[in-house]
Amino acid sequence: MNDSVTLRTRKFMTNRLLQRKQMVLDVLHPGKATVPKTEIREKLAKMYKTTPDVVFVFGFKTQFGGGKTTGFAMVYDSLDYAKKNEPKYRLARHGLYEKKKTSRKQRKERKNRMKKVRGTKKASVGAAGKK
């Protein structure tokens, strides 16, 4: 990352309950294209003396005219806390979660089996379909 790119944190908060530091992040990049999230993660990890795998950045919007991008960042104390608290789609972006995909036919068969029963019995029919 170039020296012309600056990271500024706003609204910094240490969230002890979720074992993370969360902040609004301003990326100043005058005359440059939007900075990739991987580079932002690496620079934040260096700032907070941790590894890039526990840094999650998201929700970036570039200001009209460029030069400034604003988003959110979370730095977890450990990878276990990150896996427990981050949504699955964000973990998948980092390569930490793989969704198991059932075939279309299996999904349809399960749906049709569940249509035949009512109420709380649906859970047992749905669980039987997951085997």
UniProtKB/Swiss-Prot annotation:
One Pfam family recorded for the sequence:
Ribosomal_S24e
Q: Does the keyword Methyltransferase apply?
A: no
The subcellular localization recorded is: Cytoplasm; Nucleus, Nucleolus
In terms of InterPro entries, this protein maps to: eRP_eS24_sf, Ribosomal_eS24, Ribosomal_eS24_CS, Ribosomal_uL23/eL15/eS24_sf
User: Signal peptide: which range, if any?
Assistant: none
Region called Disordered, residue ranges: 93-131
Give residue spans, biased composition: Basic residues: 101-121
A GO CC term assigned to this protein in UniProt: small-subunit processome
Gene Ontology molecular function: structural constituent of ribosome
What biological process terms from GO does the record include? ribosomal small subunit biogenesis; translation
Decide whether keyword Membrane is in the record: no
Superkingdom classification of source:
Eukaryota
Tell me which family the UniProt entry assigns to this protein: Belongs to the eukaryotic ribosomal protein eS24 family.
The subunit structure is: Component of the small ribosomal subunit. Part of the small subunit (SSU) processome, composed of more than 70 proteins and the RNA chaperone small nucleolar RNA (snoRNA) U3.
Its function, per the record, reads: Component of the small ribosomal subunit. The ribosome is a large ribonucleoprotein complex responsible for the synthesis of proteins in the cell. Required for processing of pre-rRNA and maturation of 40S ribosomal subunits. Part of the small subunit (SSU) processome, first precursor of the small eukaryotic ribosomal subunit.
Put simply, this protein is called Small ribosomal subunit protein eS24
Organism of derivation: Ictalurus punctatus
Q: Which gene encodes it?
A: rps24
